[in-house]
């Protein structure tokens, strides 16, 4: 199958490397200088250093070439950040898009839209489209280590196409038609990873970490159901699976934000050290607003937003969380 991956960051590069072993894959990046350097070195030294490209992997900085490569029955996979999805979708608008899948997670700043809502707004809803999500660190995928992902789409044909293209020795693919549930799980888990980083950074122990992750999953489920997702989706790869990895993995950028906040660092300093804003930071304000709009109780999410945007100290915020009255666990 012809596959074009649009976005040459760490995750897009890792997936391109994995799929190039079995398919005709082109990796597109908007920065011509970065792509030329990657072509010459056969390595993405900027975003995924130390991993040599398969010989068959094609690279380009020409969007038209990437779309032509995918052809009428191939697959376009968008691997930009969520902030890059709207401008890229605008660039795709003049083209005939065959099948579209995105990897980005979150709610768009200002609009509070999920990725599929952005895509439908710009490209319409006639294109077979969906989200590929789940617990996956780019470095491990690039190393060929096993992982499992979920493809979510209203189109059964697209789900089958993605399973055919991506499912293989190192990547298992499970399919669902709950696009909203998968996208909400992928978005909110980043906020909870910041909370887990705060817990770990304050030295509050593994018991507290486990409690936070568990109660965090309840928050994700409540919001997801309120927005139209199905409760059972959040027990799967895009919910529980992604949450566990992002909250506990040492490669998690969002967890690093929480660790930095617990150490007394300012958010601006943490962003400089990371080199970019973690998606949980972008997402926290949107989720707080959505929870208020839909009357969803999300104390952990609200606590993270208070630390990020309202000037609360991590330690005081944790004390406030722990002072909440007891309640039924399943509610």
Curated annotation (Swiss-Prot):
The active site is at 189 (proton acceptor). GO terms for molecular function: glycerol-3-phosphate dehydrogenase [NAD(P)+] activity; NAD binding. Its EC number is 1.1.1.94. The keyword Lyase does not apply. Sn-glycerol 3-phosphate binds at residues 105, 134, 136, 189, 242, 252-254. It is found in: Cytoplasm. One of its GO terms (biological process) is glycerol-3-phosphate catabolic process. The keyword NAD applies. Belongs to the NAD-dependent glycerol-3-phosphate dehydrogenase family. This is Glycerol-3-phosphate dehydrogenase [NAD(P)+]. Pathway: Membrane lipid metabolism; glycerophospholipid metabolism. Catalyzes the reduction of the glycolytic intermediate dihydroxyacetone phosphate (DHAP) to sn-glycerol 3-phosphate (G3P), the key precursor for phospholipid synthesis. Signal peptide: none annotated. It catalyses: sn-glycerol 3-phosphate + NAD(+) = dihydroxyacetone phosphate + NADH + H(+); sn-glycerol 3-phosphate + NADP(+) = dihydroxyacetone phosphate + NADPH + H(+). One of its GO terms (cellular component) is cytosol. InterPro entries: 6-PGluconate_DH-like_C_sf (IPR008927), 6PGD_dom2 (IPR013328), G3P_DH_NAD-dep (IPR006168), G3P_DH_NAD-dep_C (IPR006109), G3P_DH_NAD-dep_N (IPR011128), NAD(P)-bd_dom_sf (IPR036291). Its main location: cytoplasm. Keywords: Cytoplasm, Lipid biosynthesis, Lipid metabolism, NAD, NADP, Nucleotide-binding, Oxidoreductase, Phospholipid biosynthesis, Phospholipid metabolism. It holds the Pfam family NAD_Gly3P_dh_C. NADPH binds at residues 11, 30, 105, 138, 253, 277, 279.
């Amino acid at each position: 199958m012809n596959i074009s991956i649009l976005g040459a960051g760490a995750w897009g590069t890792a997936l391109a490397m994995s799929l190039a072993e079995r398919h005709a894959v082109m990796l597109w990046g908007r920065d011509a200088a970065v792509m030329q350097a990657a072509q010459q070195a056969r390595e993405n030294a900027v975003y995924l250093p130390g991993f040599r490209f398969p010989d068959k992997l094609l690279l380009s900085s020409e969007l038209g070439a990437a779309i032509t490569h995918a052809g009428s029955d191939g697959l376009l996979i968008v691997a930009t950040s969520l902030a890059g999805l709207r401008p890229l979708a605008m660039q795709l608008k003049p083209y005939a898009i065959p099948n579209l899948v995105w990897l980005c997670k979150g709610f768009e700043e200002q609009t509070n839209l999920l990725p599929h809502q952005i895509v439908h707004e710009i490209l319409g809803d006639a294109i077979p489209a969906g989200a590929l999500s789940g617990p996956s660190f780019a470095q491990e995928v690039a190393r060929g280590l096993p992982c499992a992902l979920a493809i979510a789409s209203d189109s059964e044909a697209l789900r089958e196409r993605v399973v055919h293209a991506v499912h293989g020795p190192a990547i298992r693919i499970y399919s669902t038609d709950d696009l909203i549930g998968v996208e909400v799980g992928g978005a909110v888990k980043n906020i909870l990873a910041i909370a887990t980083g705060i817990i770990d950074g304050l030295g509050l122990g593994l018991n507290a970490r486990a409690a936070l992750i568990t109660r965090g999953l309840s928050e994700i489920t409540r919001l997801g159901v309120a927005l139209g997702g199905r409760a059972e989706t959040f027990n799967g790869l895009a919910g529980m699976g992604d949450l566990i990895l992002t909250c506990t993995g040492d490669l998690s950028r969002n967890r690093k934000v929480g660790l930095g906040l617990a150490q007394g660092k300012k958010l601006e300093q943490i962003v400089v050290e990371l080199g970019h804003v973690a998606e949980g930071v972008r997402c926290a304000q949107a989720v707080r607003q959505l929870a208020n709009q839909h009357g969803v109780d999300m104390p952990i999410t609200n606590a993270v937003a208070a630390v990020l945007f309202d000037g609360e100290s991590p330690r005081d915020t944790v004390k406030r969380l722990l002072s909440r009255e007891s309640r039924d666990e399943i509610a």
